[in-house]
């Protein structure tokens, strides 16, 4: 099923939550960027250099952005400290080994850089299942595609073990989604 208008609306809400945390002129890696690397386009006025990595994209340039076909279960194909920000919007809930992926994200973030995450709260699952049953959202938005939920406190502890120092967390979309910014 192709992305629907509701899918795009929900994605834009995530983009709006993440956007203020991108420093102007920064180097950004969007892990799990999707076919269109849409967040890089959305935040283009703040991004000096952008790379989108996803297992569904073809390697090459997409406008100003480099697309890299890659699997998040493998080591990231980037040098240590290469990015000011790593963005993972609605990706965490799909990972079977989140600590491994988050450790790799930490490795490629420069000193004073940040990891910007969004993920849905458990309250959203019945809503997603209903929207999916009505064919109003794509298959990958359905809650059956999601792994075990990580509570905010457990995620923060995991990120501290990895090496992140400071955290900003807030809920958005009337509490149905979370934003966390973790700083190196």
Predicted regions and their residues:
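Conserved N-terminal segment of class I S-adenosyl-L-methionine
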Residues: 1-79, 85, 102, 142-148, ...
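Conserved class I S-adenosyl-L-methionine
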Residues: 116-138
